[in-house]
Structures are given as structure tokens and as C-alpha cells.
């Protein structure tokens, strides 16, 4: 991988894996760190940046931190783990935060926050331990388009455990 750096036992910067963009300019630091997309940084034991063809610019820092999709940031132990948001643009900071997400353009700060966001969940902010989990946002704004679809989300959850199981748009908890 052009201009790639891998430091640590089993640290890898992948090139041309089926369905994954070459990780040119990728950096992998740590035991089993794995940079799979271009211009990405995977740092920590088992940290991984991955996605589909054309994905780039991801950062995963921490034991088993994980990003899937372009421009994603996951910082903290197990942050972002199990996420499948191909559009990316999610930011998660805190242990066990931002896990199993399918949504895009979301921010989660705090341990265990911003988990299990639905496929159409976009532009949510969760601040605090366990805030903003299981948001569904099932309806959209007719006049607001993101990537060709209706805009869903716009929920703000501040405080420990706030905003759980929200369903709809423009909620503040």
C-alpha cells in the first residue's frame, strides 16, 4: 500500500482486498491493528478502519475501536463496534459508544452512548453516559434531503440515559 505504515504484531494496512478500497496512506499501530481504507488510522489493539469501495479518511483509536464508512471517527474501547453505516460521517467518543449503527452524520460522546441507531437515523447528537440509544426516527422531513432521501433524526440527547428509544424527529431530551 503506497506510503503505508504498520507497526506492531500482526498490524496490517490492506491493499486491494475484494470490496475494500486499497488503504494507500493508511497507518496501523498496535497488536492486530487493521487499516483497510485509504488515508485511515487504526491505532490500538484490534482497532479497525473498514468500509466498501471508495471509502476513505477514517480514524479508529482504542482497543477494538471500529469505523465503517467514510470520514468516521471512533475513539475509545469498543467504540463503533458492529456499525454498518456505509455513508459514514459518524463520530463516537467513549468506551462502548456508537455501536451497531446504521445511520449517518451522528455524534455520540460518552460511554455507551449513541448505540443501535436505525438505518435512516441522521444528524443526532448524544452527550452523556448511555444517552441517545435505540433511536429509530421513522418519519422524514418532506422538504429536507440528504443524499437524495428525506432527512431523519435531528434528535439531541443530553444527560445520562437521556433520549433512549426516541422515534421521530427534532426531539430534545
Task: Tell where the protein language model's regions lie, with residue ranges.
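Glycine- and small/polar-enriched repetitive beta-structure motifs of secreted/surface proteins
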Residues: 1-173
Amino acid at each position: 500500500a503506497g506510503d503505508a505504515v504498520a507497526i506492531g504484531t500482526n498490524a496490517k494496512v490492506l491493499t486491494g482486498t475484494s470490496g475494500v478500497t486499497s488503504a494507500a496512506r493508511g497507518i496501523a499501530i498496535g497488536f492486530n491493528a487493521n487499516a483497510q481504507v485509504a488515508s485511515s488510522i487504526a491505532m490500538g489493539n484490534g482497532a479497525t478502519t473498514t468500509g466498501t469501495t471508495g471509502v476513505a479518511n477514517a480514524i479508529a483509536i482504542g482497543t477494538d475501536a471500529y469505523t465503517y464508512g467514510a470520514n468516521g471517527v471512533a475513539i475509545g474501547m469498543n467504540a463503533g463496534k458492529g456499525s454498518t453505516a456505509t455513508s459514514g460521517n459518524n463520530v463516537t467518543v467513549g468506551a462502548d459508544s456508537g455501536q451497531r449503527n446504521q445511520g449517518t452524520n451522528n455524534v455520540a460522546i460518552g460511554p455507551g452512548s449513541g448505540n443501535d441507531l436505525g438505518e435512516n437515523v441522521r444528524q443526532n447528537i448524544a452527550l452523556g453516559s448511555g444517552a441517545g440509544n435505540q433511536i429509530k426516527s421513522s418519519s422524514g422531513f418532506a422538504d429536507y434531503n440528504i443524499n437524495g432521501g428525506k432527512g431523519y433524526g435531528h434528535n439531541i440527547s443530553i444527560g445520562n440515559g437521556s433520549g433512549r428509544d426516541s422515534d421521530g424527529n427534532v426531539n430534545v431530551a
